Design a protein with these regions (language model features):
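Vicinal oxygen chelate
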Residues: 2-11, 46-50, 68-177, ...
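Short Gly/Pro-enriched turn/cap motifs at secondary-structure boundaries
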Residues: 35-36, 78, 112-113
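Short, surface-exposed beta-strand-loop junctions and turns on beta-sheet-rich folds
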Residues: 63-64, 138
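Core segments of cupin and vicinal oxygen chelate
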Residues: 9-60
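A broadly used, surface-exposed interaction patch
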Residues: 57, 65-70
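Short, flexible, glycine-rich and Lys/Arg-enriched loop motifs at helix boundaries
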Residues: 37-41, 72-73, 144-147
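Histidine- and/or cysteine-centered catalytic micro-motif in compact active-site loops
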Residues: 60-62, 92
Length: 177
């Protein structure tokens, strides 16, 4: 079973739209606006991420059950580090991952990159403070991986990996010479 869509909420629909269309390269494919059960109304925007899956964004208006300044970052709202709750999108191969990293930098973002040994990931935050990852699997999982994963899942004190230090790729200058 795959994902149909994952939904997030925004307080800045224009910045969010620019981010997911220009930076991420997704296409806005559907918008629904409807009254909310508690009052007010909401707009639900669907961005095609590829393979028939979507990222949905809620834009909430005049809802008495929703505070004016609500926290859009799930992690920050729970008092957790930003990397805990995040969106991870798949790159087909390392060339696509590199092209995505270069596009993010050209859009003015510093990009973190980590080689996890079985995948390589790049990271940035969206305008809502949600961590966004693009990940390329570099090694297939085998039966030994599943067995080791189950053992580590059950371990009271699993062995820890060495700290992963990301490579930082700074944003490219947006100023023209």
């Amino acid at each position: 079973m795959g994902f149909h869509h994952v939904a997030i909420t925004t307080r800045d629909p224009e910045a969010t739209h620019r981010f997911y269309t220009e930076v991420m390269g997704f296409e806005l494919v559907r918008v629904e606006a409807a009254p909310a059960a508690e009052g007010g109304w909401a707009r639900h925007l669907f961005y095609d991420t590829g393979n028939g899956e979507c990222l949905a964004v809620w834009d909430i208006h005049d809802n008495p059950a929703v505070p004016d300044r609500f926290e859009t970052s799930i992690s920050r709202g729970l008092g957790l580090p930003s990397w805990t709750n995040h969106l991870a999108f798949a790159a087909r191969d390392l060339e696509e991952l590199t092209a995505t990293r270069d596009r993010w930098r050209a859009c003015g973002f510093d990009v973190l990159q980590i080689d996890h040994g079985w995948c390589t990931s790049i990271y940035l935050d969206d305008p809502n403070g949600i961590a966004v990852e693009c990940c390329c699997t570099t090694r297939a999982f085998g039966p030994e991986d599943a067995a080791a994963a189950e053992e580590l899942r059950r371990a009271a004190a699993p062995p820890l990996l060495d700290a992963m230090v990301p490579e930082v790729y700074p944003a490219l200058s947006l100023a023209s010479s």
